[in-house]
């Protein structure tokens, strides 16, 4: 009986708190609608720190999120970006469990920010760090997917491709690459767009996405005749490579790389990626040097990070340094 009454009182208290937040929101919204942007912004900040000091983290986060959306709708980029950062601060300090809804909210804020603003760069960096939640150093794959789709819509294909690499959306990546190749690439390089993506997915030990991106891209690209086999030797190499990865036989991998050297010489990075793939899938011992150097080192260190130990699903479980652009 006492427990039931306590629970009922708690529910009433929660309802009162929510009602109070809604009343405050109404006043702030009216202030923004009147054009009192500076005053409204300062009030949002004051309420944020007041709620946080009272451990009302959810109320603080929800108020900042709705406020950011309101400022974005009035083209107040600076105020909106500031409140977006406070949303992140509430998540970081409250140690909130990562959920798809929260990731969608963060992606929504990202999509509304000025693509050229420094605040956007800072926001996405912190958002990815928070979303990793200790389960991976690259950020949550779902957040990467949301970011990739937003950047794709903005026709920022280069950055979109990076985030697709760290998502599990091989199909989305392929569709973006088809558009990227068709609108920005040379017809003679249609095979190189997907070859690079497949090799980089494999360097991340993500066999599933590597296979999906290859199949989807080759089926949907208007300049690629249906295969296999394909007209382009490089596509045949990638097709055979994906089969070899499943089999895990070093002799097959070695012969394959030797036979297709003319195609692999089209990009100096291909053989570097294949060295890494040989280590991951075919038991090839790593080179003598303890770390990669030169151009490969820069690329691989940006793709895989510094090599902390992480238990991540298909795509990110090995910890040798590789970070790709």
Swiss-Prot record:
Record keywords, A-Z: Cytoplasm, Transport
Compartments, as annotated in UniProt: Cytoplasm, Cytosol
Ranges of compositional bias, category Acidic residues: 307-317
Organism for this UniProt entry: Xenopus tropicalis (Western clawed frog)
This protein's encoding gene: get4
Gene3D superfamilies: Tetratricopeptide repeat domain (1.25.40.10)
Subunit and partners: Component of the bag6/bat3 complex.
Pfam family, one: GET4
Entry GO terms, CC: BAT3 complex; cytosol
Main location: cytoplasm
Family listed: Belongs to the GET4 family.
Described function: As part of a cytosolic protein quality control complex, the bag6/bat3 complex, maintains misfolded and hydrophobic patches-containing proteins in a soluble state and participates in their proper delivery to the endoplasmic reticulum or alternatively can promote their sorting to the proteasome where they undergo degradation. The bag6/bat3 complex is involved in the post-translational delivery of tail-anchored/type II transmembrane proteins to the endoplasmic reticulum membrane.
Entry superkingdom: Eukaryota
Position of the signal peptide: none
Gene Ontology biological-process annotations: protein insertion into ER membrane; tail-anchored membrane protein insertion into ER membrane
Protein name: Golgi to ER traffic protein 4 homolog
InterPro entries assigned: GET4 (IPR007317), TPR-like_helical_dom_sf (IPR011990)
Residue ranges, annotated region (Disordered): 1-22, 306-325
